[in-house]
Amino acid sequence: MKNLILFLSLFVAATLSAQNKAGDIVGTYMNPDADAVLKIYESSGKYFGKLIWVKNPANLDSNNPDPAKRSQKRLGLVIMNNFKFDGDDTWEDGTIYDPKNGKTYDCKVTRDTKGNLDIRGYIGISLLGRTSHFTKIEFKEP
């Protein structure tokens, strides 16, 4: 009986630990150019990223491939979609939209020991891509 209780306790602790780890990505991050803040949030078990501050809030999504969206402001734009936690501080199977060029890329996110993110956008395989370092910050939305 003691072994069963011990096993169940360890199983529950391991499960809760894994769940907390997936949510470790949630927070606010400054982009490498320090001209935008990205808020990562969870919805229905997947992770998304939205621009909650931009240096020039009047900037429009003028490079969007959809002409109907080119008049939208970049502020508030969801640029990261559908990431799943894959363990080892990695979130995969998502996409990232780059409003500077209007292109959407496959994407993988890793978190370092300081809580910062390395966001790798790529086409096809992650070997052919670019990584940007986003710094975790405390930020209160206006």
What are these regions (language model features)?
Residues K21, N31-P32:
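Short, glycine/acidic-rich beta->alpha junctions
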Residues M1-N20:
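Bacterial Sec-dependent N-terminal signal peptides
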Residues A18-D24, P142:
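Sec-dependent signal peptide cleavage junction
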Residues N116, I123-P142:
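Edge beta-strand at a domain terminus
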Residues K108, N116-D118:
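C-terminal terminal-subdomain/extension
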Residues G87, R111-T113:
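Residue-level recognition of beta-strand termini and adjacent short loop/turns
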Residues P99, T110, G124-I125:
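Short polar/acidic secondary-structure junctions
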Residues V26, P32-K100, T104-D106, F139:
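Central antiparallel beta-sheet cores of small beta-barrel/beta-sandwich binding domains
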